[in-house]
């Protein structure tokens, strides 16, 4: 096992926290060695943040742009780090971004791969032994609430997978060349969100066996035969994708903070 180290021991890097690790493929990483034998340390959050987010525009990747006084990534990490039922937070970063890690004590950091699925696999490998469940979350959803996290964890008590979603309420069209070509029945259709939660062993095996490109981790899970429960989603839990999304996310966060 690689010796624990904090980011402030690395040149040109910021400190994560006294139990933080920089993890790389082939090494085990733990927040605190004593936690490995603690049966209550059972839920981990895996934040996928290795992408470049070009559709959002800007000079830096979207996770590093500031909203409501902090980078997007800081809001997302704090939502999970502050939750009483989350034992570990694993952050998957692009190698070029390691020097930008926020100062959050106990954060476990690993580098990502070429595709999102590669980054998730590397993040799963960095989760400490003994962890029972993992909540996989897009870094670009900084408005996730305690209640959503709680609901996913509660659903995993009886299900192998659980994810938040909102039913589609708008009319749906098909189209080509700027022309409406048909309509789509919206019954039974949902807008998927994250965090998507799973039993750790099951989703790790599912990712190892999956071949191809998946839209999200629910697709990977279902391909492995995992049943995924639908939990109520939240309209405020938007994913920052386009430039206009930054202003909306900032409004949501400032409203919660009483601004």
Please report, for each region that a protein language model flagged, where it lies by residue.
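Conserved core of the sugar-phosphate nucleotidyltransferase
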Residues: 83, 143-231, 259
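Residue-level signal for inorganic ion chemistry
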Residues: 47, 73, 123, 137-138, ...
């Amino acid at each position: 096992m690689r010796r624990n180290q904090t980011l402030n021991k690395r040149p040109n890097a910021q400190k994560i926290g006294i139990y933080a690790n920089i993890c790389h493929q082939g090494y085990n990483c733990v927040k605190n060695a004593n936690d490995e034998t603690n049966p209550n340390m059972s839920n981990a959050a895996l934040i996928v943040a290795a992408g470049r987010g070009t559709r959002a525009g800007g000079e830096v990747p979207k996770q590093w742009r500031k909203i409501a006084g902090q980078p997007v990534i800081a809001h997302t990490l704090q939502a999970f780090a502050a939750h009483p039922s989350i034992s570990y937070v694993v952050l998957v970063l692009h190698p070029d971004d390691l020097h930008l890690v926020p100062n959050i004590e106990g954060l476990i950091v690993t580098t990502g791969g070429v595709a999102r699925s590669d980054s998730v696999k590397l993040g799963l490998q960095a989760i400490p032994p003994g962890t029972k469940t993992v909540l996989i979350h897009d870094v670009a959803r900084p408005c996730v609430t305690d209640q959503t996290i709680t609901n996913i964890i509660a659903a995993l008590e009886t299900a192998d997978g659980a994810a938040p979603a909102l039913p589609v309420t708008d009319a749906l069209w098909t189209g080509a060349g700027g022309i409406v070509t048909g309509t789509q029945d919206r019954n039974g259709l949902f807008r998927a969100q994250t965090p998507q939660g799973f039993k750790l062993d099951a989703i790790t095996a599912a990712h190892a066996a999956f071949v191809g490109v998946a839209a999200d981790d629910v697709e990977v899970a279902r391909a492995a035969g995992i049943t995924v429960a639908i939990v109520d989603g939240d309209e405020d839990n938007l994913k920052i994708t386009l430039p206009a999304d930054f202003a909306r996310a900032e409004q949501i966060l400032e409203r919660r903070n009483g601004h």
